[in-house]
Swiss-Prot record:
Family: Belongs to the RNA methyltransferase RlmH family.
Signal peptide positions on this chain: none
Stated role: Specifically methylates the pseudouridine at position 1915 (m3Psi1915) in 23S rRNA.
SUPFAM superfamilies, per the entry: alpha/beta knot
Enzyme class: transferase
Species of provenance: Bacillus pumilus (strain SAFR-032)
Protein name: Ribosomal RNA large subunit methyltransferase H
Encoding gene, per UniProt annotation: rlmH
Sites where the protein binds S-adenosyl-L-methionine: 76, 108, 127-132
A GO CC annotation given for this chain: cytoplasm
Keyword match Methyltransferase: yes
InterPro entries in alphabetical order: Alpha/beta_knot_MTases, RlmH-like, tRNA_m1G_MTases_N
Location(s), subcellular: Cytoplasm
Assembly behavior: Homodimer.
Amino acid sequence: MNISIITVGKLKEKYLKQGIAEYTKRLQAYAKIDIIELADEKAPEHLSEQDMKIIKDKEGERILSKINPDAHVIALAIEGKMKTSEELADTIDKLATYGKSKVCFVIGGSLGLSDAVMQRANEKLSFSRMTFPHQLMRLVLVEQVYRAFRIVRGEPYHK
C-alpha cells in the first residue's frame, strides 16, 4: 500500500521531527510512506472570513495538485468521524482488500482545509473534538497509521 500524508506548514520542532522519522521508519515494513510538506500562507492575527477563505483556497489548490487521482483521500477535520485505532485499522484493511492501494491523508494549515479539499475527500477523520497544532497531528497520525498496520497483521501493540 502507498500512504501519502499531505500537510500544510513547515515542521519546526526537533522532537516532532524525531518522532515522525521513527514511525516513518517503522512503517516502511508495511507500506510505502511519503510525507509531502507544502508551504502555508502567511496570515496576520485578525482575519476577515473572506481573507480566511482566500488563504484556505490558496493552500487547498496546492494540496489538490499533490493528490493522486486514484487515491482514497482522508481529510483530518474536527468535524470528521472519530474512530478507534481498531476502526482505523479496519478502514485501511478494507481499502487494501478492495484494491485501493493509494491512501492520502490530508492535514490542513492553521485555518483548516478549503471547501474544495473537503469535497475531494472520500472521508473525514477526527482524532478529537479538541483543536491540536497541525504539526503535532502529523506525529499522531503517523503513529496511528503504524498502529493500524500492526493491528491488521495481528501483531502486538500497546493498548
